Design a protein with these regions (language model features):
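Conserved catalytic cysteine-centered active-site region
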Residues: 1, 34-73, 105-172, 181, ...
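ACP-dependent fatty acid/polyketide chain-elongation machinery
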Residues: 1-60, 82, 102, 246-258, ...
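Flexible, low-complexity linker/loop segments at domain and module junctions
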Residues: 1-6, 86-93, 292, 296-298, ...
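Condensing-enzyme catalytic core mediating Claisen C-C bond formation in acyl metabolism
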Residues: 3-7, 30-35, 213-292, 300-301, ...
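Conserved small-residue
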Residues: 8, 26, 75, 98, ...
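Active-site-proximal alpha-helical scaffold in enzymes
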Residues: 71-83, 139-142, 150, 156-190, ...
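Phosphate/pyrophosphate-binding loops at sites that engage ATP/ADP/AMP, CoA/4′-phosphopantetheine
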Residues: 77-96, 149, 248-254, 284-301, ...
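Acyl-CoA/ACP chain-elongation machinery
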Residues: 181-229, 262-276, 306-313, 330-380
């Protein structure tokens, strides 16, 4: 068993192309949900999302899928934060690994290639771009690209777990270090799914938010709020550098947080719904707590999944109420999707990276667009404005369509 530390974080969201600008905007209570630009969304009932604007891809990746570009850029930021260079990774040999997930792969590139196939009318020729399929569409493309650019020779994984993908990826990375299979892991997830197909598909599922009557798209996604109607699709990436204690000591690194424990589980209730008793979610939370050797009163903040859908926010809130021991103070709860949208496969790792920053800065980020709870979401301590606090332990929960449940407890190093 080996301790696992976070030494670097990187994030790209609709509020900024790095962690600093994203943090600053969320701290001020801003939301990055606006009308979609540059994409033909005629025919879509929902035409707004958390779109990353003004993004410049890393050199050499100008033609890559947008999700791959996000992943590579966020890894570069995480490495800068950790004060790591490519030579540091190469010296580790097979001790450096990559675990970068995707909920669906390069869907924008796939759509572009399919459009070419339909309209070019030339079939498979020497000049057709179809050869790009295998280098840009499979879910593992981001992991492959990062490992190739940095010449990493250790293990390489691409978890796929719907909207829990980012958190599951970090857990898989922590397991590699904990089991002694790696000394350092670049991990997280990226997602770029702002496209009419996904806007339409999620709309038909009934999970996309409607414009708020007063605030429009900016106020559409309202976690735990009485007026919640669903989420807004976001895009971007969240990446973390995980290291063993030995690796941190050897290179005189600076830990930002310790990954204290984790737990995985599933809710078999259906594709999108949660068990109304919240028992499956509560079981995973309690398992993570037991593995950490902590009590519910030790958790200072919960970074919630909170998609702002009617039933799932209610079940999640119930899990948090049941989680708190009788007589204990309830932990603060923050939900970030009102600010950065639902980044789908990247949601967990982006929100986890922001949770690491909360520990480092000793500050709790606010829940954008939460005005008042209803009967189903009352009884939890939702943070509406940024506030300083003495933080020791943060619980991050992620849920995914199909029943995926993942939890990580972060502690001060």
């Amino acid at each position: 068993m080996h301790d696992v530390y976070v030494t670097g974080v990187g994030a790209i969201t609709c509020l900024g192309a790095d962690m600093r600008s994203t943090w600053s905007a969320i701290e001020r209570g801003r939301s990055g949900i606006h009308s979609v630009e540059g994409i033909d969304v005629r025919g879509c009932r929902i035409d707004f999302a958390g779109q990353v604007r003004g993004f410049l891809p890393p050199a050499g990746l100008e033609d890559a899928d947008r999700g791959v570009q996000f992943a590579a850029a966020a890894v570069e930021e995480a490495m800068r934060t950790a004060r790591l260079g490519p030579d540091d990774l190469r010296r580790l040999g097979t001790g450096a690994a990559v675990v970068v997930g995707s909920s669906k792969g390069g869907v924008l590139r796939f759509a572009a290639l399919h459009k070419h196939w339909l309209h070019a009318g030339t079939g498979v020729t020497e000049t057709s771009p179809l050869h790009e399929f295998w280098s840009s569409v499979p879910p593992s493309t981001a992991a492959d690209t990062i490992a190739g650019r940095l010449r990493i020779r250790g293990a390489r994984f691409c978890p796929v777990a719907a909207c829990a993908t980012g958190t599951v990826s970090v857990i898989r990375a922590a397991q590699l270090i904990n089991d002694g299979c790696a000394e350092l892991v670049l991990c997280g997830a990226a997602d770029a799914s702002i496209h009419p197909l996904w806007l339409g598909a999620f709309d038909r599922m009934g999970v996309l938010a409607r414009p708020h009557p007063n605030d429009g798209p900016v106020g559409a996604c309202r976690p735990f709020d009485a007026e919640r109607t669903g989420f807004a699709i976001g895009e971007g990436a969240g990446m973390l550098i995980l290291e063993s204690a030995r690796s941190v000591r050897k290179r005189d690194g600076l830990p930002l947080a310790r990954i204290r424990s984790w737990a995985l589980g599933a809710d078999p209730s259906g594709l999108t719904g949660l068990d109304a008793t919240a028992e499956p979610v509560l079981c995973v939370i309690r398992t993570s707590l037991d593995r950490a050797g902590l009590r519910s009163a030790d958790i200072d903040v919960i970074t919630a999944h909170a998609t702002a859908t009617r039933s799932n926010d209610a079940a999640e809130a119930l899990a948090y109420r049941r989680f708190v021991a009788t007589g204990s103070r309830p932990p603060a709860v923050t939900a970030l999707k009102g600010a950065i949208g639902h980044m789908l496969g990247a949601a967990g790792s982006a929100e986890l990276a922001l949770s690491v920053e909360m520990l480092r800065r000793q500050q709790i980020l606010p829940t954008a667009n939460h005005a008042r709870a209803d009967n189903d979401t009352t009884g939890i301590h939702i943070i509406r404005h940024a506030q300083g606090s003495q933080l020791r332990h943060i619980l991050k929960l992620s849920l995914g369509f199909g029943g995926h449940i993942a939890a990580i407890i972060l502690s001060r190093p």
